Amino acid sequence: MNTQNAGKKVLVVDDDLDFLTQVQVNLEAAGFEVETAESQKQAEEYLVKNHPDVAVVDLMMEHPDAGFALSYHIKKKDPTIPVILVTAVTSETGLEFDASTDEERSWVKADAFLAKPVRIEQLLREINRFLEGK
């Protein structure tokens, strides 16, 4: 187990249970404490009493904009919580999302976008990048 990540909480939100389980197992193996939610509603209930160090959120869940809405609510509660949006929209439609500029982050309310299928190494790299110094 990676002790560097011990005590770091990651909230993972996705309605794809296979993806949710895969990410949870891999992040726990890397030493993170992982909480999961299968919907925007579940995640918002969790956030009432909890404060993750980073959130990994699927873009489209029970509503097409659920990930955007959840990201907005997370940033409204605490703008310092990094939000990584994951989506299959890019591979399905060819539309690309980006959060590399301040302007894009200001309306998207996410710190990074990752296209599904997400490689666990890529996700770990992003999480660790946001948690450096925390």
For every predicted segment, state its role.
Residues M1-K9, A115, R119-K134:
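Non-catalytic signal-transmission and effector/linker regions of two-component phosphorelay proteins
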Residues L17-E35:
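Two-component/phosphorelay signaling modules centered on CheY-like receiver
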Residues T36-E45, G67:
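Helix N-cap/capping motif at the beta->alpha junctions
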Residues E45, F68-T80, S100-D102:
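Short amphipathic alpha-helix used as the core "switch/output" element in two-component signaling
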Residues N50-V56:
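Active-site beta3 strand of CheY-like receiver
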Residues D58-Y72:
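Conserved phosphotransfer microenvironments
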Residues A69, T90-L114, E121, R125:
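Alpha4 helix (beta4-alpha4-beta5 surface) of REC/receiver domains from two-component response regulators
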Residues V86-T87:
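Hydrophobic/aromatic residues positioned on beta-strands within the core alpha/beta folds
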